Amino acid sequence: MTSPLQGEDRRFDSAPAHHSRRKQKMLGQNFLIDDNIANKIVNLASIKDDEKILEIGPGRGILTDILVKKGKLLAVEKDKWLAVVLKQKFSEEAEIIEADILDFEIPDIDVIVANLPYSISSPILFRLFKYKWERAVLMFQEEFANRLVAKPGSKTYGRLSVMANHYVETKKLFKVSKTAFQPQPKIHSQVVQLISRKPDYVLDDFTTFEEVVRSIFTHRRKKIRNCLKLNFKDIEFDDLEHMDERAEVLEPREIAELSNKIFAIKSK
């Protein structure tokens, strides 16, 4: 049986204690230490020989160590000290960039693999949606993953579910115990597959769509009519569909259709 710490590069153990505490506090970073989980994540990415891979926040390099054997790897690490050690270990096999992924201009990529920092999972995810890539296998905090993949009618279905659905098809792959990390988080994690695709609807105005989604899910227990009135004060909603329903029951396509009708009224 493989030990969770087997394969861990001992150079990372020399990190000053204050550095580790600072990184955890600033980035919400919990390092994966289970080699079996790391291998499972990479295998599920189904990487082909000629594909270009992006890893975000490689940390101590447990995924990096496997990914460099799979294809052309670009790893982006924000933490200066970790980036230095990663470059020492992987510079001949991968391109290691010290940068904040939220500011980094992502080149053409086929596959994304990452254990994302819990505290900034959402901004990173929507940053990725601005770029072209085929698929991703990402690890999130379990609660975030549940909201990401949620379907209409479920308690976790909301703004995140609808907006992510505009860009990708999501699927839960497997749960990861909190014991697979160092430091150990308070809750479990979930690995999710994302496949890029176009939505099954056409939007007349994306900004209006964002506004509608935000409006109807901010007060999710209110009727849609009452939610929209708070943000679209000059629009009469009586002739629109779904006004007496709650947002949690609408399909993304139905929300898009509602958004298009509101945009048409605004444009008159």
Task: Name what the model sees in each region.
Residues 6, 18-19:
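Low-complexity, intrinsically disordered or signal/transmembrane-proximal segments
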Residues 215-268:
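C-terminal lobe and adjacent flexible extensions of AdoMet/dcAdoMet transferase-like proteins
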Residues 21-215, 253-264:
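Catalytic cores of RNA-modifying enzymes
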